[in-house]
Amino acid sequence: MRHCIYPGTFDPVTYGHLDVLARAVKLFDHVTVAVAENTPKGPLFTSAQRIAMLQPNVTRFPNVSVTSFNSLLVEFAMAQKAIAVIRGLRAFSDFEFEFHMALMNRHLESQIETIFVMPNEQFSYTSSSLVKDVAKHGGDVSHFVPPNVAAALEAVFGTK
């Protein structure tokens, strides 16, 4: 079985993330969406909340599971018997960071490949950070995130 890991903070999950996931499920027999528990980004939502926001949005994919991880990504991938890691590239500016991460992961575990997937161009400027900033200032995020995520952001920021 061809199994991959789609890791991220997903803080919160966006339509861009889901677009990359939709592309990954066409390439692999199983995709594990892996929510990073401890991240230097200082997430707004707990890993349990991020998983809860992801779950209803991945049910349309029968070959997807969602979990969290708190280890080196390649160690987690090996433990899950995955053969690859999926990373979304929105713009060329993402490439340098992702390239260095892919090389480090290959150095740590050469059996795990990194596959770069580009989302639909309509999502190329969407990031979780921007979505949180828009929500914090009362902007409409409904074009960027699923309804349950928009509601969670509204609950945190007290805005609509």
Curated annotation (Swiss-Prot):
Its main location: cytoplasm. One of its GO terms (molecular function) is pantetheine-phosphate adenylyltransferase activity. Substrate binds at residues 9, 41, 73, 87. GO terms for biological process: coenzyme A biosynthetic process. InterPro entries: Cyt_trans-like, PPAT, Rossmann-like_a/b/a_fold. It is found in: Cytoplasm. It holds the Pfam family CTP_transf_like. ATP binds at residues 9-10, 17, 88-90, 98, 123-129. Pathway: Cofactor biosynthesis; coenzyme A biosynthesis; CoA from (R)-pantothenate: step 4/5. The keyword Magnesium applies. One of its GO terms (cellular component) is cytoplasm. Signal peptide: none annotated. Keywords: ATP-binding, Coenzyme A biosynthesis, Cytoplasm, Magnesium, Nucleotide-binding, Nucleotidyltransferase, Transferase. It catalyses: (R)-4'-phosphopantetheine + ATP + H(+) = 3'-dephospho-CoA + diphosphate. Its EC number is 2.7.7.3. Its cofactor is Mg(2+). The record marks 17 as: Transition state stabilizer. PANTHER family: PHOSPHOPANTETHEINE ADENYLYLTRANSFERASE. Reversibly transfers an adenylyl group from ATP to 4'-phosphopantetheine, yielding dephospho-CoA (dPCoA) and pyrophosphate. Belongs to the bacterial CoaD family. Homohexamer. This is Phosphopantetheine adenylyltransferase.
